[in-house]
Design a protein with these regions (language model features):
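C-terminal outer-membrane beta-barrel translocator/porin domains of Gram-negative envelope proteins
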Residues: 4-163, 168-172
Length: 172
């Protein structure tokens, strides 16, 4: 659990995204927020580095409460499961969902709290943060929701089960 006070100042330029310019027009260049945060993690994997069975769960919530200039919330949940198919093969399934929005007088989730996808932790094969809505200049601006799924088939190399695994994956 946590509580903080954040002051964010934003400068825009001619080539700034229209969504950023609109956010500044709606909320001003400088904003104070009072975020409350809560995180919960449950780790039931049989190994930290090379799991073959078990689960990992994480839930996170951030709420910017009244008293600051902006009021919003952002929540996310992740569930990861490992299944031993044989001594050498492990199946890993991972799912993540996230959603954020504003409430009260705040018009939208601040753009700097948006969700992004792409990169080694979400959709491999894409540059980090490169997937999602784009501005007119082709820059990824993120969004207020995200759904990510990953499937991996992991193969422990004989004689090196505790140090090396190869994997085939599919991410969406």
């Amino acid at each position: 659990f946590g509580m903080g006070v954040d002051q964010t100042s934003i400068s825009t330029f001619d080539n700034s995204s229209t969504s950023i310019k609109q956010f500044v027009a709606d909320n001003g260049e400088t904003n104070l927020t009072i975020p409350l945060t809560a995180n919960w993690i449950s780790d039931g994997k049989d190994s930290y580095l090379f799991p073959t069975t078990g689960w990992y769960q994480k839930a996170a919530l951030e709420v910017a409460i009244p008293g600051g200039d902006l009021t919003f919330y952002k929540a996310s949940y992740q569930l990861q499961r490992y299944f031993a198919i044989s001594r050498s093969f492990t199946l890993m399934l991972n799912g993540e969902v996230g959603y954020g929005d504003s409430y009260g007088d705040t018009v939208a989730l601040p753009f700097y709290k948006n969700f992004y996808a792409g990169g080694v932790n979400t959709v491999r094969g894409y540059k980090a943060g490169s997937l999602g809505p784009q501005d007119i200049y082709g820059n990824t601006i993120g969004g207020n929701e995200r759904v990510v799924g990953q499937t991996e088939l992991l193969w422990a190399l004989p004689g090196m089960e505790k140090s090396v695994r190869l994997g085939v994956f599919f991410d969406i």
